[in-house]
Curated annotation (Swiss-Prot):
This is Nucleoprotein. The gene is N. One of its GO terms (molecular function) is RNA binding. Residues 1-24 are annotated as: Disordered. It is found in: Virion.
């Protein structure tokens, strides 16, 4: 009975339901290999996802959810997540401090 537990993430993708990415492996599974640079001495920008990595279109809430999860994992100050036809681009501005800020833009209404 070693394989009693099924793989919920695989089943969720098969059923078309998207679950929140909660770990680095989930992010890699969804968006492919990401490139991350260590925080430099002064604030700069880094793109940790290449165009074309997006497996599906993200709606506004999924963008906020993924943005929140990515920020929580990388312990960054603030960032912005944009999804378009080219793919996913997550741009972060590193802040030279150990304080963790969570800054997720509210969904844009019509």
């Amino acid at each position: 009975m070693a394989s009693r537990r099924s793989r919920p993430q695989a089943a969720s993708f098969r059923n078309g339901r998207r679950r929140q990415p909660t770990s680095y492996n989930d992010l890699l599974r969804m968006f492919g290999q990401m490139r991350v640079r260590k925080p430099p001495a002064q604030p700069t920008q880094a793109i940790i996802a290449e165009p074309g990595d997006l497996r599906h279109d993200l709606n506004q809430q999924e963008r906020a959810t993924l943005s929140s999860n990515v920020q929580r994992f990388f312990m960054i100050g603030h960032g912005s997540l944009t999804a378009d036809a080219g793919g996913l681009t997550y741009t972060v501005s590193w802040v030279p401090t150990k304080q963790i800020q969570r800054k997720v833009a509210p969904p844009a209404g019509p």
